[in-house]
Curated annotation (Swiss-Prot):
Keywords recorded for this protein, A-Z: Pyrimidine biosynthesis, Transferase
Subunit (UniProt): Heterododecamer (2C3:3R2) of six catalytic PyrB chains organized as two trimers (C3), and six regulatory PyrI chains organized as three dimers (R2).
Residue sites binding carbamoyl phosphate per the record: R57, T58, R107, H141, Q144, G269, P270
Designated name of the protein: Aspartate carbamoyltransferase catalytic subunit
Function: Catalyzes the condensation of carbamoyl phosphate and aspartate to form carbamoyl aspartate and inorganic phosphate, the committed step in the de novo pyrimidine nucleotide biosynthesis pathway.
Listed pathway(s): Pyrimidine metabolism; UMP biosynthesis via de novo pathway; (S)-dihydroorotate from bicarbonate: step 2/3
A GO MF term: amino acid binding
UniProt-listed PROSITE patterns: CARBAMOYLTRANSFERASE
Reactions mediated catalytically: carbamoyl phosphate + L-aspartate = N-carbamoyl-L-aspartate + phosphate + H(+)
GO biological process, alphabetically ordered: 'de novo' pyrimidine nucleobase biosynthetic process; 'de novo' UMP biosynthetic process; amino acid metabolic process
Amino acid sequence: MTPRHLLAAGDLSRDDAIAILDDADRFAQALVGREVKKLPTLRGRTVVTMFYENSTRTRVSFEVAGKWMSADLINVSASGSSVSKGESLRDTALTLRAAGADALIIRHPASGAARLFADWTAGQSDGGPSVINAGDGTHEHPTQALLDALTIRQRLGGIEGRRVVIVGDILHSRVARSNVTLLHTLGAEVVLVAPPTLLPVGVADWPVTVSHDLDAELPAADAVLMLRVQAERMNGGFFPSVREYSTLYGLSDRRQAMLGGHAVVLHPGPMLRGMEIASSVADSSQSAVLQQVSNGVHIRMAVLFHVLVGLESAGEEGAA
């Protein structure tokens, strides 16, 4: 992990990732029993969120994380900024740097946008603001991978040696890419299940096993991560019909019964109930969907701490 940014899951060494997971747990514990959920950890720091794509879970959890750590939080949307008047992404980045922001959290539809932000705002004596990638096109979503890993660790007691099956639209999924990288770093075995049309070129070079048969992979799965079909990123027919896709790749009640009793079901959201996952499965005791949301806040607290304060234990800071 670079000292000031989190741009991709590959930025994290195994030790870095475990430190963030551990600190997320510590922050969660530090908040237990507090009537007012406020820690002084980032008091005096200015954090700017910039979301050029719609978001509920990621945006809200970053905002809650910043507020709970006492940061001064500023939200910038494309429609409410000079971007709507034609300002370039580079000029926006330089403006926020000049304004003195300590951290920039960016989501953008273009792959690589977060790294460009980091490059454009660097190079001066103070090093520029920290940049956190909240999702860039189909490229990366590192904090989602971290919260998924935390959820798996909490549910299963560990990640190393666990078999994680990722199902659905791998081609358009930044969540899948970040999860594959991070889970491999943490020692998990990753299986991708998708129709051939929803697998990216070059997937044979990824550290994964590829399958087209969901029924065959479920009995040995420790965790199943269901992905939404991202129709907004498609301009052609990737599968014959929603009904056929759901029949072949949806997590139904019948398929849930194939899972071991210990297995956990995850979904990064938003869920298309009745397509990739049945409502009964999403609301079952094996589902960790809401636990993922809660963990998202604590993971993003840990990430903000690590990029703004440093790669060290958050225990004393969190308990202050």
